[in-house]
Every structure is written in structure tokens, then in C-alpha cells.
């Protein structure tokens, strides 16, 4: 998975999305699927992800171990994070989402841009492998687009915040 060479390994956020696979009927939800994401705050990008039928500490541990260590990790109040060994400090937010706002926003982007993750959608994934493949492709494009925005804004600091596909030649 592509990660920006400008990644600041200071603060990471972790969260998970719940969804289902295999079938979609009004009385049957199929198999649970969880998308676990780890993001860097600067630049705003997904640095690791995994998909499984349940949230498991060993999968989150593999995500943490798969990239260079961050100084601080932030997660929601899920007790599963207590079983993960973080290299830096870990803050578990039990009462609010003040320290997980970035990962919540990125997870909202995943739901928005990937039809199979939308709520009340007619699309769904029949297999976890398909969901993993779609996420891998999307995350690569998402991270590269975010890098293109960063480069564009660096080169044109007074140009405003608007950025679209017509600006991609700046990368």
C-alpha cells in the first residue's frame, strides 16, 4: 500500500467500521465484516487496514507492527485495544471522540466513496477477499490524491483550499 514519504509518525488513530458480506435480505444480514483502519494525522492518510469477521487484537497488532512506530496512538473506547502492544503512548477515548476525529472522517469517506460500504445501499460484497481488494485499490488512490493535494497547496499557498482532478498534474 502506498504511504506518503512525508508521513509524520507522531500521531496515529485507530477505528473500525462494521458491515456485512454474502447476503442482503430484509430478515438476514449475512456475515459480519469489520474494516479496521489506522491513519496518520499528518498527512491525512490511511497507513494500515485489515478486514475480518470480528475485531481481533492480533489483527490490530499486525497493523501496528507492519509500519514504522508512531509516538502516540489514539483509539475509541473499545476494550480490544487493551490487548494491543503499542510502541508509543496509547490514549483510549472512553467518553468522546475528540482524539479520533480524523479516523472517523476517513471512515466516513470510505462509506461515501465505496458503494458496498454505504448504509442502505443495494451493493454488498459477497466475499471478504473482494472487500479487501476494493479497499486496497481505493486506499492507494485515496492516499495518492491526498499527497497531490498537499503538494498543490504547498506550491500555491494563497490559492485557496479547492482542489480537483484537474490539478493532478502537480504531483
Predicted segments, located by residue:
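Residue-level recognition of single "structural anchor" positions
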Residues: 1-171
Amino acid at each position: 500500500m502506498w504511504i506518503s514519504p512525508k508521513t509524520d509518525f507522531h500521531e496515529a488513530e485507530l477505528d473500525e467500521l462494521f458491515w456485512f458480506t454474502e447476503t442482503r435480505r430484509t430478515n438476514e444480514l449475512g456475515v459480519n465484516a469489520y474494516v479496521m483502519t489506522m491513519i496518520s494525522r499528518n498527512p491525512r492518510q490511511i497507513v494500515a487496514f485489515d478486514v475480518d469477521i470480528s475485531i481481533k487484537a492480533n489483527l490490530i497488532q499486525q497493523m501496528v507492527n507492519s509500519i514504522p512506530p508512531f509516538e502516540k496512538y489514539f483509539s475509541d473506547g473499545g476494550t480490544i485495544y487493551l490487548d494491543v502492544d503499542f510502541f508509543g503512548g496509547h490514549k483510549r477515548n472512553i467518553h468522546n471522540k475528540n482524539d479520533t476525529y480524523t479516523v472517523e472522517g476517513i471512515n466516513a469517506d470510505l462509506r461515501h466513496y465505496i458503494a458496498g460500504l454505504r448504509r442502505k445501499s443495494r451493493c454488498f460484497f459477497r466475499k471478504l477477499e473482494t472487500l479487501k481488494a476494493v479497499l486496497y485499490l481505493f486506499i492507494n488512490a485515496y492516499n495518492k490524491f491526498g499527497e497531490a493535494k498537499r503538494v498543490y497547496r504547498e506550491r500555491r499557498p494563497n490559492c485557496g483550499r479547492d482542489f480537483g482532478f484537474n490539478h493532478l498534474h502537480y504531483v
